[in-house]
Design a protein with these regions (language model features):
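Conserved phosphate/metal-binding and DNA-contacting active-site motifs used
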Residues: 2-258
Length: 259
């Protein structure tokens, strides 16, 4: 499988790059786990977790203390994510059609999920929460998360994460981009949706962190394959300016702040 994973034969136990062609899911899951990223199955051909068993679907049942997770089953999505290679082999060898998800929180990852959906932009005060955009600024042509994130980065004198070649970036089948970063120390960054009125980094820019998961590069759905782009194949440290913006927009629990 070395040629499929774009690694040398001597590096098979810890592949050095995510797949450049669609690999077997078990190899992809092992590649992620070898980096300390807990993995969990996604439904075949989809980007959502596999369904719970009948008992775990009952109202009021949660992942806390769930016997299924304790027994090594995959109920409750990213809550069942594991680094156990024996469990990984069992899950994906027996069910090779499953996709691979990565639990962001325990993996200490913050992933900037940039969307490119065709939508009418909201009022300018919703484009960059907490940052007023004067009426004198022409927003003609602004159409998606690539644009709003680019504006935010420009205001801070920084490179947009979409153009950050120092870190792992993954093109999504819908034309979006997942930009992977390593979280700072013990900070527990929180998830958000770019459309949220309570916590958001920018319009059409989601944040995947604690309490969420991300589709692993190399995973294939009915819509296409999540493909790593650019030279980097590992997440870089979360840039300081971006950490400050995440803190400013409420992505840390109360009484926590970045150093």
């Amino acid at each position: 499988m070395a040629h499929e994973l774009d690694v040398s034969p001597s590096d098979r136990e810890r592949p050095g790059s995510p797949p450049v062609v669609a690999p077997r899911s078990v190899d992809l899951a092992r590649w992620c786990a070898s980096r300390g990223w807990p993995v969990h199955p996604l439904a075949p051909g989809r980007k959502t977790p596999t369904a719970n068993c009948e008992r775990c679907r009952q109202p009021g049942h949660t992942h806390k203390g769930c016997a299924c997770i304790q027994a090594g089953r995959w109920c409750h999505g990213f809550h069942a994510a594991t680094l156990d290679f024996a469990r990984i082999e069992q899950w994906w060898f027996n069910h090779p059609g499953l996709g691979v998800g990565v639990a962001c929180g325990p993996a200490h990852l913050v992933v900037i999920d940039i969307d490119a959906h065709r939508q009418q932009p909201p009022d300018r005060d919703r484009l960059l929460p907490g940052i007023p955009i004067p009426r004198s600024v022409d927003l003609g042509g602004l159409a998606n998360g690539f644009h709003t994130l680019g504006v935010l980065a420009a205001l801070r004198g920084a490179v947009s994460p979409a153009d950050d070649e120092t870190t792992l970036r993954v093109r999504t089948p819908s034309g979006g981009l997942h930009v992977w970063y390593r979280a700072h120390g013990s900070h527990r960054w929180q998830c958000s949706a770019g459309s949220s009125s309570t916590r958001a980094l920018a319009w059409q820019v989601d944040v995947r962190a604690n309490g969420g998961y991300i589709v692993a590069p190399g995973t294939t759905t009915v819509a296409g394959t999540y493909t790593a782009v650019g030279p980097a194949r590992e997440p870089a440290a979360l840039p300081d300016w971006l950490a400050r913006e995440l803190a400013r927009t409420g992505h840390l629990p109360p009484r926590a702040s970045p150093t």
